[in-house]
A protein has these predicted regions:
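Acidic/histidine-rich, metal-coordinating catalytic segments
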Residues: 343-351
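Conserved H-loop
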Residues: 340
Length: 427
């Protein structure tokens, strides 16, 4: 199909149905098409090497390496905007309180972790202590990528690509490329709410749905949806001689399948098709997708709002409450469905916040932050070094690519080749 491949067309069309799909030609029948789903395009470059940062363990960890499960799944939960690590995993340190006279959380309100004397969790994260006691929680304090910067765009690019140069592929996209079978499956990598660039590969296709609750055919009043579907399918053959149109035609059946799959997962998890997109809602959909046994290997969940320059305390409380509710419900669901032993959940955010609060009851862009990994084993890695700040920022004490390497080992594949170097693992 000439140089305008079907895969590339689907990206350029920017359409809504995203199994292998874009189909912008048909977007008039899709509600808010550009916001609902886009294909992650293949890229043209593959990255080189990165520097390593050694792990500093500040608490006893479970040391046994888990046996890789069959059909492993990694769920990446992105706190978009730059989560304030210091008010998430709170140091029991006077320097923290001095730097944040109005934002510092009271030591007495924090959630303690057995065996940890230097930190407490934000009160909204109380259920994480249960994961800790069950040896299912790893915490990375001071996580980041050296030279990631304070720009949302630059830092997000660094976190998604696992590089600080102009790499155009995502680290998960490179894994999808490396493990792609003879029959492409665009549901192996799915992003809900955003996070497209982390799935970008050279050859693999992934699915990105901005809003699962709105990912559906928008039929006019009085119109039979089955008739619309048949009309779509009737236009899929014979293929036109013009490459772009033929590419759109070829995508139609898979596009319709994608709508059915996502809506089935959504309705199975939450009967309200118009529920607000949130960690809770998106993770419910993710649990439904895992239970459908679609050979999905990576699900990326993205929720904005963590750029807390002003009025942080209440907003951050609400965001972490939603995060924790979503994670708890998700884990309860996959345990009930019998999938928990093959799932590793990892939180990310493109950077942390500055140590000192600003004059607007908030915090500005910083450097190091915190990550959580829920799965086998427990431990606290890295540290918040409040006594050796770098231009007012927490220094990065553990490269997040150690967490990435741990996740890639869980999935199976050429971890060091994908990351461009060898990084210490968290198990």
């Amino acid at each position: 199909m000439s140089e305008l491949s079907r895969r590339r067309f689907l990206y350029l069309s920017g359409g809504a149905a995203a199994t292998a799909a874009g189909v912008g030609v048909w977007a008039a029948l899709l509600r808010g098409e550009s916001e609902k789903g886009i294909l992650v395009p293949p890229s043209t470059t593959l990255g080189g090497t990165s520097s390593t940062t050694s792990t500093t363990t500040t608490a006893a960890t479970t040391t046994s390496v888990p046996t890789p499960p069959q059909n492993p799944v990694v769920v990446i939960v992105q706190m978009d905007g730059g989560n304030d690590g210091l008010n998430t995993l709170v140091p029991l340190d006077g320097i923290y309180h001095d730097a944040r006279p109005t934002l510092a959380l009271s030591d007495s309100d924090l959630i303690s972790l057995t065996g940890i004397n230097d930190f407490g969790l934000h009160p909204a994260l109380a259920p994480l202590s249960e994961f800790w006691d069950k040896e299912m929680l790893k915490i990375v304090a001071g996580s980041g990528i050296p030279e990631q910067g304070r720009s949302h765009f630059a830092a997000t690019d660094a976190w998604h690509s696992a590089r600080t140069d102009k790499e155009e592929t995502g680290w998960i996209g490179r894994w999808l490329d490396a493990t792609e079978g003879s029959t492409p499956n665009p549901l192996r990598g799915i992003a809900l709410g955003g996070g497209a660039s982390i799935l970008t590969g050279k050859s693999s296709i992934s699915t990105v749905i901005k809003s699962p609750s709105n990912f559906r055919l928008a039929t006019p009043p009085g119109t039979d949806s089955e008739s619309i579907v048949l009309a779509f399918l009737n236009t899929a053959s014979p293929l036109a001689s013009e490459p772009a149109l033929a590419a759109a035609q070829s995508a139609i059946p898979n596009s319709l399948d994608a709508i059915g799959v996502i809506n089935s997962a959504k309705s199975e998890a939450n009967p309200d098709p118009y529920a607000e997109e949130s960690f809770t809602s998106l993770l419910e959909t993710a649990a439904g997708l895992i239970n459908m046994n679609l050979d999905t290997r990576v699900i990326v969940i993205s929720v904005p709002g963590f750029d807390t320059h002003a009025n942080q305390l209440g907003r951050h409380q609400d965001l972490l409450t939603d995060f924790m509710t979503g994670v708890s419900n998700f884990w309860n669901r996959i345990e009930s469905d019998g999938h928990a032993d093959r799932v590793l959940l990892m939180s990310t955010s493109e950077f942390g916040r500055r140590v000192e609060e600003n004059g607007s009851s908030g915090t500005d862009h910083g450097a190091a932050s915190v990550q959580f990994l829920i799965g086998p084993g427990k431990g606290l890695y890295g540290n918040f070094d409040l006594r050796n700040l770098v231009k007012g920022d927490l220094p990065i004490t553990l490269d997040t690519r150690s967490a990435y390497a741990t996740a890639l080992d869980w999935l199976g594949g050429p971890t060091d080749e994908i990351l461009g170097d060898s990084y210490s693992r968290l198990f």
